[in-house]
């Protein structure tokens, strides 16, 4: 598999395709738009959400204010399909293991356009409070996917654009350096791909109890999911 070099892969593309996949699992389609890749430090352009025939049409989108321009730099590399596939498989495994807990979380998030960003920031801050590892990065993607699905279920489709932007910003600003220092997404594929070691070869913490803390306004940590770099 080709390596991305010093710039890494396009985090925006990884986020957009992951969200598209999670929404498609529930019968929704998402057009992420035609904006170019956002390099680390820059925010992406939001996309447009639509539903399949028979679904309630998405309300019109209000775009967030444009972010400050980022300094010019090398463009990130296109993302190999195997990266998307491995991340999807890891997220699906995570979701299956905690299916009931995620269902309860979805029903209790009480997302609104006014609370969504605070919910996102609180969970993500606590998720990475004790450091970064690949498991927590997968949990980050899966939590973002849950927020997007719940937003559409509650007829707040424009929030999907914002969640995608927040995820990309966080990856670019806070996780990109760790990812590159630990071999990039290529290392994730090599460590956790189909022919490599199982994803779940360690003890898991109780996600249900930790999510319950978040839902009453306390901090949340998703624990040592994967538990390794």
UniProtKB/Swiss-Prot annotation:
Residue list for modification Phosphoserine: 63, 77
Motif (BH1): 126-145
GO biological process terms on file: autophagy; extrinsic apoptotic signaling pathway in absence of ligand; intrinsic apoptotic signaling pathway in response to DNA damage; negative regulation of apoptotic process; negative regulation of autophagy; negative regulation of cellular pH reduction; positive regulation of apoptotic process; regulation of mitochondrial membrane permeability
Motif extent (BH4): 10-30
One cellular component term from this protein's GO annotations in UniProt: nuclear membrane
Compartment(s) where it occurs, according to its Swiss-Prot or TrEMBL record: Mitochondrion outer membrane; Nucleus membrane; Endoplasmic reticulum membrane; Cytoplasm
Composition bias, Low complexity: 33-61
Chain span(s) of sequence motif BH3: 83-97
Pfam families: Bcl-2, BH4
Motif (BH2): 177-192
UniProt-listed CDD domains: Bcl-2_like
Region (Disordered): 30-82
Database matches in PROSITE patterns: BCL2_FAMILY, BH1, BH2, BH3, BH4_1, BH4_2
UniProt membrane topology term: Single-pass membrane protein
GO molecular function, a single term: channel activity
Protein purpose: Suppresses apoptosis in a variety of cell systems including factor-dependent lymphohematopoietic and neural cells. Regulates cell death by controlling the mitochondrial membrane permeability. Appears to function in a feedback loop system with caspases. Inhibits caspase activity either by preventing the release of cytochrome c from the mitochondria and/or by binding to the apoptosis-activating factor (APAF-1). Also acts as an inhibitor of autophagy: interacts with BECN1 and AMBRA1 during non-starvation conditions and inhibits their autophagy function.
Sequence similarity: Belongs to the Bcl-2 family.
Domain remark in the UniProt entry: The BH4 motif is required for anti-apoptotic activity and for interaction with RAF1 and EGLN3. BH1 and BH2 domains are required for the interaction with BAX and for anti-apoptotic activity.
Subunit structure: Forms homodimers, and heterodimers with BAX, BAD, BAK and Bcl-X(L). Heterodimerization with BAX requires intact BH1 and BH2 motifs, and is necessary for anti-apoptotic activity. Component of the complex, at least composed of LRPPRC, BECN1 and BCL2; the interactions prevent BECN1 from forming an autophagy-inducing complex with PIK3C3. Interacts with EI24. Also interacts with APAF1, BBC3, BCL2L1, BNIPL, MRPL41 and TP53BP2. Binding to FKBP8 seems to target BCL2 to the mitochondria and probably interferes with the binding of BCL2 to its targets. Interacts with BAG1 in an ATP-dependent manner.
The name this protein goes by in its record: Apoptosis regulator Bcl-2
Origin organism lineage: Eukaryota, Metazoa, Chordata, Craniata, Vertebrata
